[in-house]
Amino acid sequence: MLESSSDKIKFAPIKEVDYKKPVSKSKNYTLINDIQPLEWYCHNDSETGYQHTISNKTDGGRGLFRVMKKSMETRVETQTLYFTDLHTGLCGFVQLLYSTVMGGIYKGFQLNFKVFGSESNNTDYDVWESFKLDDIAEFQPLKFVSRNVIFEFLSNKNEKLGSIGQLSIKCDLPTCNNTIQNLKIDLLVDLFQGFKMNPNGCNYYFDKQISMSDEFVSSDKMIRHVFVPRGKCNGNISYDKKLNSGDFQNKNISLTDVPVVYLDAVQGLLPNKAASKWNFLCFQSENYSVLAIEFTTPRDHDNVTVTVWSITEKNKLISIGSSVQSPKRHVRFRATSTDKESGWVYPTSIKFPGGFSEHDLRLVNRYDVLGELPSMVRSLAQKIVSIKPFIYQYCQPSKYKHEKGISIVESTFIS
């Protein structure tokens, strides 16, 4: 019997999970109870490993074709720690980014650092900067060392606390840029139980249609996520921030048992090929964490919406859910506003699965991703590739199950 065209797909998403079932009762996700599954996904990738050397040798036409094919390959992996200080209202993230583009011709690491307040009158610490990292001394599955940054997972379980291990982040960047100087980070994080959706946290993309009945397909082109929805962070962050007067003022942030989220994300294709839009939530309170991430594939890959979320209570996962093409369990914009410059309709009130809503989103950053490009290049990107990427970031006091906390929300529009 011939297969119909409706049995063919170009996108194979993660498995759906019924959030009402008890945690650990589903075969559609894998719980993470030690640090090993948190290792760099790209480290062992023979195509993109940092220590992989690109050969200039070619073997005639086939070698040239291989180089041309590799030139289209791209992969980005980020390991991000979001922190939410419930006492001071200061929030932010420390992110280590690894990228390989043009089949590995360019490879490198970057540190992204952002701090913002949850209240409109708390902007003194606001900063968002990126730093290219040179002099890489070590890149192992669970450890990265450069001249200025150490990012390392430690197998220090604490059964009494319930932690699966620790993450240590140390940074010393004396000369940064014109906005901040002397960035120093010294954090130690206790990580609690995490999870990844099956298969292996991956959503796969295909250039040609494949049969839906093939359960074991995979592709180098993918979106992959590994989640640790709850952790506790202790340590210090300090930097000198440039004031309007031109002088620099020292800022010091002391974190004591501050709730955090850790997220590992891999994107094995260009951003505009992976998704047309994204939504993200990180809510933290004294007892609860609510985490959600959602993306919609472009038209070339069937406009599929994938949503994943979890709820943690007292450092333990109590609910995990995922939805593919089920509108009732996707993110909903309850109220919106139109950006006159970009044309995007962005949320001012939002509802996430898992029972979380925020009716009064407070925009802390509106970022034009192409804004730093020359106007001609930006115009070409918008016209030829049909992309206009904008990120809308929000942070505000919120409630979940009548408990006060702080939520970080992001809505990203690409094409």
Swiss-Prot record:
Pfam families: Svf1, Svf1_C. The keyword Magnesium does not apply. It is found in: Cytoplasm. InterPro entries: Ceramide-binding_SVF1, Svf1-like_C, Svf1-like_N. GO terms for biological process: response to oxidative stress. The keyword Ligase does not apply. Keywords: Cytoplasm. Present with 1010 molecules/cell in log phase SD medium. This is SVF1-like protein YDR222W. It comes from Saccharomyces cerevisiae (strain ATCC 204508 / S288c).
